[in-house]
Structure formats: structure tokens, C-alpha cells
Amino acid sequence: MGKNIAMKEARARAGLSQQELADKLGVSRQTINAIEKGDYNPTIWLCIGICRVLGLTLNDLFWDEE
């Protein structure tokens, strides 16, 4: 699993810290950090929540073209 650069960049564009995104999703900041580092594979429901908060699609954030 690689780093989720798209999610990190989208979060930054939205002006959210890891803690702010975590609070909106009801998860810990460590969970957001682990997803962005590629150390944690989130559930589909968490992926959908992240997409809703950031205003993007699953393809935008989680689809790997490689």
C-alpha cells in the first residue's frame, strides 16, 4: 500500500488539518495520518465519509491507476 498523496493534498486544499478531518469523521487524528501514510486501509464507509467531507469521489482519492 502506498502513500495517499491525493487525500493529503485534498485535505490541504480544503483547509483542514488532520485533526479537523478526523473530528468531522469521528475518528482519531492517528487514523487519518495512517491512511495518508499508507499504513491503514480504511473501510469503504470511512472512504465514503472522507470523500463527502472533501467533496471528491472515491475515484479521485482512492483509485490507483498503476
Locations of regions flagged by a protein language model:
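A short, Lys/Arg-rich alpha-helix, primarily the initiator
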Residues: 1-13
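Alpha-helical residues within the helix-turn-helix
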Residues: 12, 23, 52
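Residue-level detection of the helix-turn-helix DNA-binding "recognition helix"
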Residues: 12, 26, 37, 66
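Short alpha-helical DNA-recognition segment
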Residues: 16-34
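Key DNA-contact positions within bacterial/archaeal DNA-binding proteins
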Residues: 30, 40, 59
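DNA major-groove recognition helix of helix-turn-helix/homeodomain DNA-binding modules
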Residues: 45-60
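Short amphipathic recognition helices of helix-turn-helix/homeodomain-type DNA-binding modules
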Residues: 60-66
